[in-house]
Amino acid sequence: MKTPEHQAWNPTSWQTRPAQQQPSYRDATALADAVAKLSRLPPIVVSWEVDRLREELAAAQRGERFLLQGGDCAESFDDCESDKIAKRLKILLQMSLVLTHGLKKPIIRVGRMAGQYAKPRSADTETRDGVTLPSYRGDIVNHAEFTPEARAPDPQLLLRGYERAALTINFIRALIDGGFADLHHPEYWDLGFVGHSPFKVEYERIVASVADGLEFFETISSKEVHTALRADFYASHEALVLHYEQAQTRFIARNNRWYNLSTHMPWIGMRTAQLDGAHVEYCRGIANPVGVKVGTAMDAAWLQRLVTTLNPQNTPGKLTLIHRFGAKDIESALPKAIQAVRATGHSVLWICDPMHGNTESSQSGLKTRRFENILRELDLATRIHQDLGSHLGGVHVELTGEDVTECTGGARGLADLDLQRAYKSSVDPRLNYEQSLELALLIAERNRAPRRSR
């Protein structure tokens, strides 16, 4: 009998496996029609961009690059607005400039954008005042309003999700091609928080050094820096709603491979990483680089099987393991995970998600995360990898370019009482603009590479 990873694969073979976290559509014909329409639409990304990202991730595995992956916990259709997209892109690019300066290596920029419209839920239903309805699973599945009509999964939302994703990625490409007027000039960045930090001197030194380096580049190259340093930017989302992913899976004859062209880098979450499950089955057959969230519930045998199933040929850049243990558990859990993967003989890219393992409830009942715990998990991850002869190749964060108050701490010392001032997330708390940039400054300072000898 063939094991799951040795059975024949095609874009629909996931339908023969147990599929967690999938919507229960009432009308199978309407679903089939929506999937058929979606499969005829142009791809959102192209195969050569996917291949280029895989090559860059392979370089990150070798320690030659660093992955910055970030964006909203869950995108909403209403947030498909030029200003909000530009702010998210801008903070990611600003963070990448700071990290490039501090780490002295190129940064791979990957957004949780242009497709992050679905969210896994801990329960299939929600009950309010004695009324039970399907859980809200993200805008690509149903609506947040607590009514039977809004909560019914609607296949047409798959098409609306495609449209929003295409609009988002096209606008991002236009912004990158045109350059931001102030992106490469730190004197125009919003750095008001720096004066509130005990690391004020270090932050100011880093920002001044970035500005000096960019000014020097423009002087010797006779080009504006944003035209010479055009930033590649990639999209990623959790491959959760598999009918959507299936419909955008295309065979590229010149490569003789199947690609998911709804995004550059799909990932599998903890709730859908079952070895015999539909999500692992789907992701094992595509040429895209794939991420997998790794938490405390995943034992060594499970992790090892995932590695060999998702990347049987040990292709460099194919598999990124995103560990999310939390500051309190990382010291006991991460060494076991590193040793388990090493025993397979396979190479992976290790990156840290310091957000999900550090979620807690505030005194007012809002979900929040403490900046100090986020930073502590990153610090511990870096040290543990170094101690075990491995290396941390990136960071995965939930953030926004807006002035929200969802995570406590940071230079301004946001407290529980501050959260209600601008708490906008409908799912998980995000770092705001200032906290995101501060995190990049701290990573750059604590992992500063020595200056190369001339």
Name what the model sees in each region.
Residues 401-419:
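Short glycine/proline-rich, acidic loop/turn segments that cap or connect secondary-structure elements
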Residues 294-295, 354-358:
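Conserved phosphate/anionic-ligand binding catalytic regions in large, soluble enzymes, centered on
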Residues 68-73, 110-113, 352-355, 398-400:
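Short loop/turn segments at strand-loop or loop-helix junctions that form parts
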Residues 57-60, 98-100, 282-283, 384-387:
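A general structural signal for short secondary-structure junctions and capping/turn motifs
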Residues 74-75, 79-326, 369, 377, ...:
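Active-site-facing alpha/beta catalytic cores
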Residues 52-54, 276-279, 306, 335-337:
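Glycine-rich, charged/polar anion/phosphate-binding loops
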Residues 1-66:
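N-terminal basic/disordered segments at the start of proteins
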Residues 303-306, 310-312, 318-349, 356-405, ...:
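Non-transmembrane, aqueous-exposed alpha-helical and coiled segments at domain scale
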